[in-house]
């Protein structure tokens, strides 16, 4: 059964901490099934005292069309093969097809949201701009997943601007 949720605010639902999901349905924009960790696996990787911490095994994403929201949790281990797999979790065609099931004569709001390692990005627009919204969403997803937060954090915490560390190693 598809995870379609009724609600007034797609962004609020896209930022929810625990996602459960089922296998894909015919109206879903997603091509991959939900890969949410089991409860035991979730507890192994999370500190229960810090409810704002993301599970390090993957990321959350959602597509919302009006009041209907489709959510997915996808596993991502930051390898090239994993990146290629999750970038194909939806396409412009699959989003257009799913969205067309909810379009009437009026324009509806469409929202894409992704959350990875504490960073959330939400892109929204009207149904008439869905193609542009898809392009912005895939670009945002690709940039967010290709960031190396550990490397950036280590340079910032040492007070070194990016690239300084490389120069010091070469001059030794």
Swiss-Prot record:
The keyword RNA-binding applies. Gene3D superfamilies: RNA silencing suppressor P19 (3.30.390.180). Residues 1-38 are annotated as: Disordered. It holds the Pfam family Tombus_P19. Keywords: Host-virus interaction, Inhibition of host innate immune response by virus, RNA-binding, Suppressor of RNA silencing, Viral immunoevasion. GO terms for molecular function: RNA binding. GO terms for cellular component: virion component. GO terms for biological process: symbiont-mediated suppression of host innate immune response. The keyword RNA-binding applies. InterPro entries: Tombusvirus_p19 (IPR004905), VP19_sf (IPR036131). Residues 1-20 have a biased composition (Basic and acidic residues). Homodimer. Acts as a suppressor of RNA-mediated gene silencing, also known as post-transcriptional gene silencing (PTGS), a mechanism of plant viral defense that limits the accumulation of viral RNAs. Binds to short interfering RNAs (siRNAs) with high affinity. Acts as a molecular caliper to specifically select siRNAs based on the length of the duplex region of the RNA. Belongs to the tombusviruses protein p19 family. This is RNA silencing suppressor p19. It comes from Tomato bushy stunt virus (strain Cherry).
């Amino acid at each position: 059964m598809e995870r379609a949720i009724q609600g007034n605010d797609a962004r609020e639902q896209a930022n929810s901490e625990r996602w459960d999901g089922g296998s894909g349905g015919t109206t879903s924009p997603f091509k991959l099934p939900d890969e949410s960790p089991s409860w035991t696996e979730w507890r192994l990787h999370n500190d229960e005292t810090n409810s704002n911490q993301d599970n390090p095994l993957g990321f959350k994403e959602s597509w919302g069309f009006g009041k209907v929201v489709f959510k997915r949790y996808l596993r991502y281990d930051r390898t090239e093969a994993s990146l290629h797999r999750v970038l194909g979790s939806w396409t412009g065609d699959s989003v257009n097809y799913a969205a067309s099931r909810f379009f009437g004569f009026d324009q509806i709001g469409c929202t894409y949201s992704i959350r990875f390692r504490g960073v959330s990005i939400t892109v929204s627009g009207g149904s008439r701009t869905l193609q542009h919204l898809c392009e912005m969403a895939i670009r945002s997803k690709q940039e967010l997943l290709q960031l190396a937060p550990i490397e950036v954090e280590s340079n910032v915490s040492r007070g070194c601007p990016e690239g300084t560390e490389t120069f010091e190693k070469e001059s030794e």
